[in-house]
């Protein structure tokens, strides 16, 4: 019925990488996730340890969702609501529900970052062509989508830590980008 369900309750315990795979499959096939599967993901997100974080397949699945040409915003939001996102990217967990108090930001840092990915995807798809014609043209000329999407996700990752969040964010990017599978040139660009 258009919703992704789990075959049995211990599904994630057998292979915690499946936590990422569930979201990637939902994105790939345009499916919603059954509420029981979301509850299981939230319960089992604790299974995401350093081994899962460093797992190349898990990182590839995450990058697939982040750079999806479909609806990355919705799927990233589901990942965030289930706590899988913050468990997989611990630096993101630090900005969940963090308020920003200035005239440019109307959302918490996590929601702002997820929404930024959504806007990028909408510009790329042409949905915002009338409102953002120049951005739509420029988007077609981007050399590396994944660099742009990763950079967009990480642009405020170090907010609230004291000091210049762009400098602190650079250190996070230097560690996270190779883990996600970006090469040295892509990492430097981010």
Where on the chain are the PLM-derived regions?
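Long, hydrophobic, amphipathic alpha-helical segments used as structural scaffolds
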Residues: 30-33, 124, 184
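Divalent metal-dependent catalytic cores for phosphoryl transfer on phosphate-bearing substrates
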Residues: 99-102, 108-109, 135-190
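Non-catalytic interface/linker regions that flank or bridge core catalytic/transmembrane domains
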Residues: 1-105, 174
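Helix-hairpin-helix/helix-loop-helix acidic hairpins
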Residues: 124-135
């Amino acid at each position: 019925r258009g919703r992704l369900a789990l075959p049995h309750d211990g599904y994630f315990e057998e292979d915690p990488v499946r936590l990422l795979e569930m979201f990637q499959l939902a994105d790939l096939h345009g499916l919603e996730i059954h509420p029981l599967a979301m509850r299981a993901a939230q319960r089992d997100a604790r299974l995401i340890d350093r081994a899962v974080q460093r797992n190349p397949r898990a990182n590839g699945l995450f990058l697939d969702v982040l750079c999806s040409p479909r609806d990355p915003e919705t799927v990233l939001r589901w990942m965030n609501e289930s706590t899988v996102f913050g468990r997989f990217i611990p630096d993101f967990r630090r900005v969940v529900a963090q308020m920003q108090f200035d005239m440019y930001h109307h959302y918490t840092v996590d929601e702002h970052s997820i929404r930024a990915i959504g806007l990028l995807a909408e510009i790329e798809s042409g949905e915002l062509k009338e409102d953002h014609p120049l951005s739509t043209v420029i988007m077609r000329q981007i050399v590396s989508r994944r660099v742009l999407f990763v950079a967009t996700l990480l642009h405020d990752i170090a907010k609230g830590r004291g000091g210049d969040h762009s400098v602190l964010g650079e250190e996070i990017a230097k560690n996270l980008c190779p883990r996600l599978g970006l090469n040295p040139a892509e990492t430097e660009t981010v």
